[in-house]
């Protein structure tokens, strides 16, 4: 979808539809302005349009006055903020998609006033609008068409999701044109990177193995200009990454270890390492999961996909920050060669782990990756993302990720980035008292700590593999990354984490 910005009068736009965002507090005045611009009669519909958040009404303009064919009134609610803007634009996109309209405009002449209400900038309002519209348009349609090869190779010239809308036009005033254009361009980059992540996470495991994922990483690096190195099984064995190899023992598909390196052309503000869990399909291994909802376990690589999306977006936005992305990838399968409960693994760090439960596999592969990135790249900050625990969903639901960190400043930055980006996180404790829950009698540590504090003990386990690094955060994205993943709800991937990470990196100091 093409995204463009214009200062031309709204009436002159030859489009299938034009939308007017309207808040409840400004409803009366806004409707009068819409009437003046479109020729619609306010008295015929003003009582029927509530202006509640994401509410919609379609009208037909005076075609002698306007070049566009339809009018949409889009509700922003009482005190519209960034989340309301995203939600409203997503609602609009869904309706436009349903009606199969090809060209759509949005009147953003009021972006300045909206930015003041939302306490943010004009460019961020435009960015948010584009992100929301892209989100509402998204469909996972690759396996319903002849696009299977494109999905696996990532090398098609048209490898973005197929969308009904051909162009989104943001119409605004000349005074804020440059700000709206800047925000629209940024929003388009972030949203398309996030859509790519959603495609990867929604892909069935027979189309997205560890090998397939590595190929997608290579294709993205080649297209967007960041370096990619992929370790094969022989290299992983040479490095003695016992966590990744242990999880992979039950699979006939070899593991991969993908490394992404983005470096800015000019001076760098620092080096950030992103580590993502890449369990391509999680049966639980010998500690096998119930069959109900197991198909959603194709989404257990969402953290790894997020890392690819964030690195890709950083490269496309040309951020002045060095970004290292690491994704250990494998599936977790039961077989005669699979690891057993009670086995002891030696990780890349040399720390030994008692595998008390083979379904706690994500932390095992992350353990190797965390130590590797710390020792190899010495980053200023390490952030890992993983659909790690059902316990985090119990604690925070499906809208919020768990945040665990050994650095108060980093935790605060992530919290604020999440609030602004609409991908919220909430900090959880990682006090030393929890260490006793993962104490092992036969190894240095156990990979699970029992029923209580499951998300916390998982974070405490990971903490051991960053050692003395003083700026680390773990994001448990099990709830928001794939709503319904633990109950067979089948809601599909959200791409949660991409906007959060990009927002953090764009404001790096």
Curated annotation (Swiss-Prot):
CDD domains: Peptidase_M17 (cd00433)
Cofactors demanded by this protein: Mn(2+)
Any matching Pfam family: Peptidase_M17_N
EC number annotated for this UniProt entry: 3.4.11.1, 3.4.11.10
Family affiliation: Belongs to the peptidase M17 family.
InterPro entries the UniProt entry points to: Leucine_aapep/pepB, Macro_dom-like, Peptidase_M17_C, Peptidase_M17_leu_NH2_pept, Peptidase_M17_N
Superkingdom of the source species: Bacteria
Organism: Chloroherpeton thalassium (strain ATCC 35110 / GB-78)
GO molecular-function terms, A-Z: manganese ion binding; metalloaminopeptidase activity
Function: Presumably involved in the processing and regular turnover of intracellular proteins. Catalyzes the removal of unsubstituted N-terminal amino acids from various peptides.
UniProt-annotated binding residues for Mn(2+) 1: 282, 359, 361
Keyword Metal-binding: yes
Protein name, entry field: Probable cytosol aminopeptidase
Keyword Glycoprotein tagged: no
Residues that bind Mn(2+) 2: 277, 282, 300, 361
HAMAP family: Cytosol_peptidase_M17 (MF_00181)
Keywords: Aminopeptidase, Cytoplasm, Hydrolase, Manganese, Metal-binding, Protease
């Amino acid at each position: 979808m093409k995204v463009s910005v214009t200062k031309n009068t709204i009436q002159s736009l030859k489009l299938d539809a034009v939308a007017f965002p309207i808040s409840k507090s400004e409803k009366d005045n806004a409707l009068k302005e819409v009437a003046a611009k479109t020729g619609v009669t306010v008295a015929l519909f003003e009582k029927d349009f509530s202006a509640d958040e994401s509410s919609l009404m379609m009208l037909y303009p005076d075609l002698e006055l306007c070049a566009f064919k339809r009018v949409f009134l889009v509700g922003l609610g009482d005190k519209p903020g960034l989340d309301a803007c995203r939600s409203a634009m997503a609602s609009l996109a869904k309706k436009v998609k349903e009606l199969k309209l090809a060209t759509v405009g949005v009147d953003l002449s009021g972006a300045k006033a909206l930015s003041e209400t939302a306490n943010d900038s004009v460019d961020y309002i435009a960015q948010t609008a584009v992100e929301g519209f892209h989100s509402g348009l998204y469909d996972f349609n690759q396996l319903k068409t002849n696009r299977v090869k494109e999905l696996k190779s990532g090398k098609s010239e048209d490898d973005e999701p197929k969308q009904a809308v051909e162009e989104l036009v943001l119409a605004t005033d000349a005074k804020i044109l440059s700000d709206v254009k800047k925000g629209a361009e940024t929003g388009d980059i972030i949203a398309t990177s996030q859509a790519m992540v959603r495609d990867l996470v929604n892909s069935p495991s027979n189309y997205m193995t560890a090998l397939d994922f590595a190929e997608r990483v290579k294709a993205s690096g080649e297209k967007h200009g960041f370096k990619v190195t992929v370790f094969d099984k022989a290299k992983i064995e040479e490095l003695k990454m016992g966590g990744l190899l242990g999880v992979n023992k039950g699979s006939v598909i070899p593991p991969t270890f993908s490394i992404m390196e983005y470096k800015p052309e000019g001076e760098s503000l620092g080096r950030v390492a992103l580590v993502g869990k890449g369990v391509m399909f999680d049966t639980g291994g010998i500690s096998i999961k119930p069959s109900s909802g197991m198909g959603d376990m194709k989404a257990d690589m969402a953290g790894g996909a997020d890392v690819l999306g964030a690195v890709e977006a950083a490269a496309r936005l040309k951020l002045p920050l060095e970004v290292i992305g690491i994704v250990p990838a494998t599936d977790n399968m039961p077989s005669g060669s699979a690891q057993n409960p009670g086995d002891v693994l030696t990780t890349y760090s040399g720390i030994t782990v008692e595998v008390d439960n083979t379904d706690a596999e994500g932390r095992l592969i992350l353990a190797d990756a965390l130590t590797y990135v710390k020792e190899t790249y010495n980053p200023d900050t390490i952030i890992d993302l993983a659909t790690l625990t059902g316990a985090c969903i119990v604690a925070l639901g499906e809208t919020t990720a768990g945040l665990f960190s050994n650095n108060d400043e980093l935790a605060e930055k992530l919290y604020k980035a999440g609030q602004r980006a609409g991908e919220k996180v909430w900090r959880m404790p990682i006090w030393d008292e929890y260490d006793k829950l993962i104490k092992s009698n036969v190894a240095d540590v156990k990979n699970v700590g029992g029923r209580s504090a499951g998300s916390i003990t998982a974070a405490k386990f990971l903490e051991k593999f960053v050692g003395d690094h003083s700026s680390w955060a773990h994001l448990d994205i099990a709830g928001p990354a794939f709503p319904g993943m633990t109950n067979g709800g089948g809601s599909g991937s959200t791409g949660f984490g991409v906007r959060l990470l990009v927002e953090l990196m764009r404001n790096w100091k």
